[in-house]
Each structure stands twice: as C-alpha cells, then as structure tokens.
Amino acid sequence: KNERSGVEIQLDRSDFNFPTLVLGNFVNIIIISSRFIAGADGSNSIAFFMYAVVILNVLLTSVIGNVSTILLRKISIKKNTRLMIYSLLISLCIGLLMVVGLHYFSYDIIKFVYLRGEFNLFDVHETSSYLLELSFSFLFLFIATTLFQPFLTLPIGETKRVRLKMVVFFLLSIAFAAIYSEFNSFTSKESAVFVMYFSSINAVFLAFYSYIKYDQYEK
C-alpha cells in the first residue's frame, strides 16, 4: 500500500508485456543498435557517435519527454485530439529549430562542450559532423515519441496482437538496415547514420499506425 494514500496498486503479468517494453523504449533500441554499428570496425567512430547522441538525447528527454509525459497523463483520462495535435506541432517545431541550429552551430556547440583534455580539434570536427548528420533522424524520433503515447494507454490485453506485429516489424527494420549497410560496404559512420535514419523513419510510420489503432479503439 501507498503510505500516504493507502491505495493498493495491483500489478499483473501483462503489465510486463515484452512488446510493450520494446515500444516504450524504441528510441533507446535504435540508438543502441546504431551505436553497435558505429563501433563495428573498431575505430573511434563509436566515440564520436556517442558524444553527438548525448547532446541530441538531452533535448529528446528534457523537452519531448516532458511533452509526452503530459500528453500521456491527459489522454489516459480522456481522449484529447486537440492536445495530441498541439503536442505533435511542438515536437515538430522543436525538432526543426534543432536542425536549423545545428546546421549553423554544431561545430561551436561541440567545441564548447567537449574541447578539453585529450579531445582535440579533429575530434570536434568528427563529432560535429555526426551531430549534424544525425539531427534529422532525431526529428523523426521526436515525432514518433509523441505519436506513440496514445496507443500505449490502451489495455495491453486487448491490443496484444497489434503490439506484437509492430514490434516484429520494428526489429526486422533494424536488422534489415544493419544487414543492408554491411553488404554495401558502407563505412562505420555511414552504416550508423543509415541505421538511425532507416529505423527512425520506420518508427514514424509505426507511430502513425499506432495512433490510427488508438483512434479506432476509442471510437
């Protein structure tokens, strides 16, 4: 029981449904998969990738994460299409501002944040290049993160099949991107960027599909 309210929360095995865990952490799965690809050749590319992702992920978790939390809280009580549209527009605007800002200031940002100790100007250049090239993929992740929230409020038991199909498609898209980049002799950087973009674009399609399912369920 909760000591303050005295309310007992009942947990069921379905609350730990694997597809739900995957869909709820799709951003981390995409980043980890791309990170693995970035370091596949044993070069420093993985370090530059992670330095860039740290900065992009801060914006994702601090701004888009809060927007999604508010949206999730509201629509779990009552369907609110207007709030959904507002949240999506906020995510889109923030993402576009980020892309434009990084186009002009990615080098300066990396230099200000990381240029110290062993981190030299070459590292600044390589990391800022990653930062700029990954920015659009994070714009897609911003959109997908917002769009997924309504679907995740639906009862797991009644949407289990849909969740499983979405997860299978999502994981296969990552596997396909990794295999495709491997057989096309991409550099580690090109492979990591390709996996990020291919997976994040597929995540947007899945997120739109999930919202359609949510809308059908709520009618």
Question: Whereabouts are the PLM-identified features?
Answer:
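Hydrophobic alpha-helical segments of multi-pass membrane transport proteins
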Residues: 140-147, 199-218
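Helix-loop junctions and terminal segments of transmembrane helices
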Residues: 61-79, 148-153
